[in-house]
């Protein structure tokens, strides 16, 4: 099957009707791109990269736009879609609390915490999450993306079920990120480089 790829320098070159738009621009311009695209074209579905926006007003205005237009929209939080976590979820006993801990060095706490927050919500089946303790380092660092910043430290939070999440990002040499999921009596430990897991341990000999 032949697939034709077309490259355009502006929205004006795109077809009038689009089944899907993926907006993976920097967060500083994403709101403008989204508004222009939905104003100029008929859009059936949207996928947005995180972090969504840099300004609170953008969240409010885009939320109103999407509700008015009824365009189905997703944020790219991919961890819940992986086979590993899909297999772990049914092994958890939701009659007991889930304790999730993420620890590593320079994993981009400012931009990537959302992935672990979403995974926590997926595994617990509870979306009313909030941080209860914030312990960030004073020094703000330059992000790998020019003009953006990152930070390190520790964030602790939970939900109404009593589940807890502990995010630790250290300012040390790059190394693996450890994800530990405790749900008595089960314990799952994953060492990852964020994209691919390369070491996995389970208390019940579960082997994905």
Locations of regions flagged by a protein language model:
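NAD(P)-dinucleotide binding in Rossmann-like oxidoreductases
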Residues: 157-208
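A structural signal for short coil/turn segments at secondary-structure junctions
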Residues: 41, 69-70, 95, 124-127
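Short catalytic-loop micro-motif centered on adjacent basic/acidic residues
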Residues: 22-23, 46-48, 73-76, 166-168
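Rossmann-like dinucleotide-binding domain that binds NAD(P)(H)
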Residues: 99-175
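Short loop/edge segments at beta-strand edges and connector loops
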Residues: 7-9, 48, 75-77, 133-135
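Beta-loop-alpha module in the N-terminal Rossmann-like domain of NAD(P)-dependent dehydrogenases
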Residues: 3-47, 51-65
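Short beta->alpha connector loops
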Residues: 26-29, 52-53, 79-81, 171-174
């Amino acid at each position: 099957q032949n697939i034709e790829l077309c490259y355009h320098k502006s929205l004006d070159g795109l077809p009038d009707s689009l089944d899907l738009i993926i907006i993976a621009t920097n967060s500083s311009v994403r709101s403008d791109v989204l508004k222009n695209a939905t104003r100029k074209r008929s859009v059936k579905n949207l996928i947005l990269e995180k972090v969504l926006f840099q300004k609170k007003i953008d969240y409010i205005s885009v939320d109103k736009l999407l509700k008015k237009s009824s365009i189905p929209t997703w944020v790219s939080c991919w961890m819940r879609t992986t086979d590993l976590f899909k297999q772990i979820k049914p092994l958890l006993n939701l009659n007991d609390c889930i304790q999730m801990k993420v620890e590593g060095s320079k994993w981009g706490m400012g931009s990537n915490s959302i992935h672990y927050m979403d995974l926590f919500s997926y595994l617990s089946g509870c979306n009313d999450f909030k941080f209860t303790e914030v312990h960030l380092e004073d020094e703000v660092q330059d992000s790998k993306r020019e003009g953006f910043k990152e930070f390190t430290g520790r964030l602790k939070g939970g939900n109404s079920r009593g589940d807890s999440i502990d995010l630790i990002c250290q300012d040390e040499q790059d190394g693996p990120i450890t994800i530990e999921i405790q749900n008595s009596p089960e314990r799952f430990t994953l060492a990852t480089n964020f994209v691919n897991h390369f070491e996995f341990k389970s208390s019940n000999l579960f082997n994905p």
